[in-house]
Amino acid sequence: MISLDGIRKVFKAKRGSVTAVDGVNLKINEGEIFGVIGYSGAGKSTLIRMLNMLERPTEGSVIVAGKDLSKLSDRDLRIERQKIGMIFQHFNLLWSRTVRKNIAFPLEIAGVPKKEREKRVDELINLVGLEGREEAYPSQLSGGQKQRVGIARALANNPKVLLCDEATSALDPKTTDSILDLLVDINEKLGLTIVLITHEMHVIRKICHRVAVMEAGKVVEEGPVLDVFRKPKEHITKEFVKQVTEPEETVQHLLNEVKSGRIVQLTFVGESAEKPLITNLIRTFAVDVNILQGKISKTQEGSYGTLFIHLDGPKDEIEKAITYMHEQQLELEVIAGA
């Protein structure tokens, strides 16, 4: 659906130049939700703006639905841009227009007849859950409602791709989740390809199928969300994963608290996160099992979790319990107790 080949973006400055995106290659599949995560200055905003040519790449090609956008004439590019919707962190609504007229705006520009335009606006209002707020102005809306207007407006021309530029960064956690749920619903109902950028791993975990991690203009890691959570390779990726998996207290604190037995860190992925592991350990082996800390989260591809447990008892029984856990295909690390 989307292919980025050797994308590079250099901005000229008074003292030299700044490379914002440096040699990025990405393939984004049709119908998937693809996330790009990175800290401020990583180049992710520049990258997403090149997907619809709001920024033109210095080098490389941007191919969307088989067409190289970087080689199109201005007229042809305007036509192709209608197939790519975009929503923004600060909504970018027209404050003098009602909800209905904001959503209708791109249809007016496209020359859609009034009756057809009104029908499409009604469909979109229902899709994003803004029934009863059609005649309200942006100043009368909550942050979440404003973003719903932005989403509806971005979908007005039936795009094939939706770009989300930090779309939930200005929202509180509860509203963020409601907008993320809406994006998943739209993805499933419309088969829409969604590309989002964020600095929050919670957003990636909750709705993305695959993720790319950016640092200093480069993609340093990429893959299915579950794989990246399970085995992050780069230091920056590990930092992001810790946002949603790291227990509140440190491992060092656990080491100081426990004087005997073994402390084991378990990583659950997919179906293994649903198994009654602790119950089976207690029933099968002569060991005491104490849960120290843990968390299980849901991703679009299945469950993911981390768990710290303390095993105490006869040494041979502890060894049997650890062997059993290995046999359950769990990621396991003994972090204390030789």
UniProtKB/Swiss-Prot annotation:
The ABC transporter domain, residue ranges: 2-241
Assigned EC number: 7.4.2.11
Subcellular location: Cell membrane
GO molecular function: ABC-type D-methionine transporter activity; ATP binding; ATP hydrolysis activity
A cellular-component GO term for this protein: plasma membrane
Primary location: membrane
SUPFAM superfamilies hit by this protein: ACT-like (SSF55021), P-loop containing nucleoside triphosphate hydrolases (SSF52540)
Binding site for ATP: 38-45
Catalysed transformations (reactions): L-methionine(out) + ATP + H2O = L-methionine(in) + ADP + phosphate + H(+); D-methionine(out) + ATP + H2O = D-methionine(in) + ADP + phosphate + H(+)
Membrane-related topology note: Peripheral membrane protein
Transmembrane parts of this sequence: none
Keyword terms, alphabetized: Amino-acid transport, ATP-binding, Cell membrane, Membrane, Nucleotide-binding, Translocase, Transport
PANTHER family: AMINO ACID IMPORT ATP-BINDING PROTEIN, METHIONINE IMPORT ATP-BINDING PROTEIN METN 2
Function: Part of the ABC transporter complex MetNIQ involved in methionine import. Responsible for energy coupling to the transport system.
UniProt family annotation: Belongs to the ABC transporter superfamily. Methionine importer (TC 3.A.1.24) family.
Record note on quaternary structure: The complex is composed of two ATP-binding proteins (MetN), two transmembrane proteins (MetI) and a solute-binding protein (MetQ).
Identification of the protein by name: Methionine import ATP-binding protein MetN
Native source organism of the sequence: Halalkalibacterium halodurans (strain ATCC BAA-125 / DSM 18197 / FERM 7344 / JCM 9153 / C-125)
Gene name tied to this protein: metN
